[in-house]
Amino acid sequence: MINKVKGKIIQIIGPVIDVLFENVSSLPMIYDSLEVFNPKGNQIILEVQQHIGECTVRCISMDITDGLKRGQDVFSLGTTISMPIGEEINGRVFNVVGNTIDGLGDLNNSKRISIHRNPPKFEYLSTNIDILYTGIKVIDLVEPYIKGGKIGLFGGAGVGKTVLIQELINNIAKGYGGLSVFAGVGERTREGNDLLREMISSGIIKYGDSFLEDMKNGKWDISKVDKNELKNSKATFVFGQMNEPPGARARVVLSGLTLAEYYRDSFRKGRDVLFFIDNIFRFTQAGSELSALLGRMPSAVGYQPTLASEMGTMQERITSTKNGSITSIQAVYIPADDLSDPAPATTFSHLDATTVLSRKISSLGIYPAVDPLSSTSRILSIEFIGNDHYLCAQRVKQILQRYQELQDIIAILGIEELSEEDKIIVHRARRVQRFLSQPFNVAEQFTGITGKLVNIKDTIEGFNLILDGKLDNIAEVHFNLKGTISEVIDSSKKKI
């Protein structure tokens, strides 16, 4: 039993609370948890951030501080924020402090581990490189992902980051068979709800046949959830949504990462874990809010002076060891579509592959709106992907680059003023651009088109046929939202 040390609140400024500890041998340590109860009797967890004076600590709250008052008792728990572990966490939904929020009962008796942990030691890190195929043409061809790597999805508001991350969950988590952890950081509660329902429908989270049947009929009766079946689920959720205070949004990434680390390290042979973060910018944004509230001098564009170190501390824990791997896919919001903003720019340096979503491509109706010229991968070389794949990817990039250079001339003088050779380049580049689009399973309700997963060999074959001029006689419209090149050919034979 932990001997709780009692203090009292002496100041409340929004989510920042100062607590006085009198007549104690030592103050709670940095990152230690304190608890206080609001007028409704709900527990609120505070995390120590600063020692100010001899007897006072400054804390950030993990929940809304409405109803708290000066003079109220606060108790030190003697531990940091921690997450439950064990097979009981499979399929469950947690908040930042490890409490369940899915209505399926608490896990009070489970063993817990701290969310503040050191990265694995250098000698335990793995150096193996394997390609993680996603079934999405533009990703697999021009910016292949690395199993056990860190991947960033960059884009402004409304260009498709969340839809792409949901499709990646659908494609990889289903076909891959490993365990997944999803951290919802400062995003819409509705999206978290939609994702949970999608996971239940697809069988990644197992609520049992009885619940599933009711769900199909529009009901949500959690009393019908099969707890034994739930333990066989392949995904776990941790949410700190946009309506929550900055303390929760700043720590929820670490809470989710702690579960991913547990899955990776908890078995003798280890496991390969998928760790999805939506959205890593909100982690930075919450840190900026807290920094201002704690009185630190802001740096460039108002961000916290500790931006690089906070990001580095978190990203260094997302790594692969000889025991297992964590493949991290992170959505990154780009403020005002400015890639030079300090928040996305700081994230760039930690990533193995970047997928940049473009508003310009989105406006053309090409989805996913990935910009193949701005997107990168450190394994796009013959050494890792082979000669055929590399040459095809380079040819695709070259023709799109040339098309981009010609667009100014086309806008001013018109396409008729181009040389015959450049006209051919433009026509083929437009076909390539449209063939990079693809119908998604998670977007089927919007497009009315069944989602497609495309093998890398079929992808290379299709683009080579376009680049070699074998399909010049097929109109551009037939290349849009198709999977394989055979679908394009079949579509061209039908009357529009």
Swiss-Prot record:
Record's protein name: ATP synthase subunit beta
For this UniProt entry, what is the primary localization, expressed as one broad class?
membrane
For the ligand (ATP), the binding residues are: G155, G156, A157, G158, V159, G160, K161, T162
**Family per similarity comment:** Belongs to the ATPase alpha/beta chains family.
- Where does the UniProt annotation locate this protein? Cell membrane
Q: Which GO terms describe its cellular component?
A: plasma membrane; proton-transporting ATP synthase complex
Topology of the protein relative to the lipid bilayer: Peripheral membrane protein
Q: Reaction catalysed by this chain?
A: ATP + H2O + 4 H(+)(in) = ADP + phosphate + 5 H(+)(out)
Say what the protein does.
Produces ATP from ADP in the presence of a proton gradient across the membrane. The catalytic sites are hosted primarily by the beta subunits.
Q: EC number(s) on record?
A: 7.1.2.2
Describe its partners and assembly state.
Answer: F-type ATPases have 2 components, CF(1) - the catalytic core - and CF(0) - the membrane proton channel. CF(1) has five subunits: alpha(3), beta(3), gamma(1), delta(1), epsilon(1). CF(0) has three main subunits: a(1), b(2) and c(9-12). The alpha and beta chains form an alternating ring which encloses part of the gamma chain. CF(1) is attached to CF(0) by a central stalk formed by the gamma and epsilon chains, while a peripheral stalk is formed by the delta and b chains.
InterPro entries this protein is in? AAA+_ATPase, ATP-synt_VA_C, ATP_synth_F1_bsu, ATPase_alpha/beta_chains, ATPase_F1/V1/A1_a/bsu_N, ATPase_F1/V1/A1_a/bsu_N_sf, ATPase_F1/V1/A1_a/bsu_nucl-bd, ATPase_F1/V1_b/a_C
Judged by the first EC level, this protein's enzyme class is translocase
Q: Give the species.
A: Karelsulcia muelleri (strain GWSS)
What Pfam families does the record point to?
A: ATP-synt_ab, ATP-synt_ab_N, ATP-synt_VA_C
Supply the alphabetized keyword list: ATP synthesis, ATP-binding, Cell membrane, CF(1), Hydrogen ion transport, Ion transport, Membrane, Nucleotide-binding, Translocase, Transport
Is Membrane one of the keywords? yes
